[in-house]
Amino acid sequence: MTNALRTAGLDAVYLEGGISGWKDAGLPTRKKIGAVGDRWVTREHPKIDRIACPWLISRFISPLAEFIYVPANEVLAVAEEKRATPYDIKGAEFGHVGDRCSFDAIIRIFEIQDSALDHLATIVRGADTSRPDLTPQCEGLLAISYGLSANHPDDHEMLKHGLIIYDALYKWCRLQAEKHRSASKTAA
């Protein structure tokens, strides 16, 4: 699998101990979902959730996933035609529910447990649902997302650059979680 991922251009390393080693290290795992494939479709002209979700899917669910952006009125037809999973559209399983965004839905449905990812989800939710009061980083993500959109009118080009932004933001969230755990141990 490592070689297949490297061949696909992904920076993959072999984890000694496989999934057991992953779990023993306390790293997040996910629930297997039957009908979800490696092809996902959503509305064109992504900003926040429609870039955050592909990042989440490619980093935690399916590293070889393909993402398709189409006009909103074509999402369901393309999903059926291409056997793709629709996301971030009204009524989709992987869509907004209440005050939660599609990013939250994916985390919930796949049962991904990771404190850094929970922090990132709050940032994404605040930026995507116009609630910058959730955490100070929401406004920054919103600004970066609109800047990326203005710089990259091609959706896949924006996605390529957006993945780098989300990698960095997730790393920052992990560092914050580690700092919090260290402070808790010191206080104990």
PLM regions and their residue ranges:
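A broad, structural surface signal
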Residues: 3, 54, 58, 62, ...
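Rhodanese-like catalytic fold shared by cysteine-dependent sulfurtransferases
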Residues: 1-47, 54, 81, 88-91, ...
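Polyanion-binding interface signature
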Residues: 38-133
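A charged, amphipathic interaction segment
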Residues: 109-188
